[in-house]
A protein has these predicted regions:
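Hydrophobic transmembrane alpha-helices
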Residues: 1-148
Length: 148
């Protein structure tokens, strides 16, 4: 897809500050995705251990425990936002912002992950019951903190 974006491009050079911005978008996405997945991994290994200096805050029903702070306190699927930002950062760096073809890559993640989040929430509601409802009040945003 990236090679298709180079066909018939104007020969303008992207300014350095824009390349830095594009790289920041990618690395913010990488930090969200990798950081959230690592926090979940370490929490499952030892629920009392801190991660990046953050003491885990949880809710429990006695049998099950859900993490409600750190990355997972920002939104219920913050790692999905990270994946979308990484794809966007890659396209901005290697594609041309005005070409359509490269944008299919981040659009693929949006089309894949937004419906998947709805399915994940349904599965979690069935699995955790009342605990999930309590979790929804603690972490109201689905993917994008403060927006959705």
């Amino acid at each position: 897809i990236q090679l298709w974006s180079t066909v018939d491009l104007p020969s303008t050079q992207t300014p350095l500050y824009m390349l830095v911005l594009y790289a920041l978008i990618f690395f913010c996405g990488w930090g969200l995705s990798r950081g959230a997945n690592l926090q979940k991994y370490f929490f499952k290994k030892d629920p009392t251990k801190t991660y990046l200096g953050i003491v885990p805050e949880t809710i429990t029903d006695g049998n099950r425990t859900l993490l409600v702070n750190g990355f997972w306190g920002l939104s219920r699927h913050i790692n999905y936002l990270g994946e979308i930002l990484m794809a966007t950062g890659i396209i901005l760096c290697v594609g041309h912002p005005t070409m359509l073809w490269p944008w299919l890559y981040p659009l693929y993640y949006v089309v894949l992950l937004f419906p998947r989040q709805i399915d994940d929430d349904k599965r979690c509601a069935a699995k955790y019951g009342a605990l999930w409802q309590q979790y929804l009040t603690k972490v109201p945003y689905r993917i994008i903190p403060g927006i959705y």
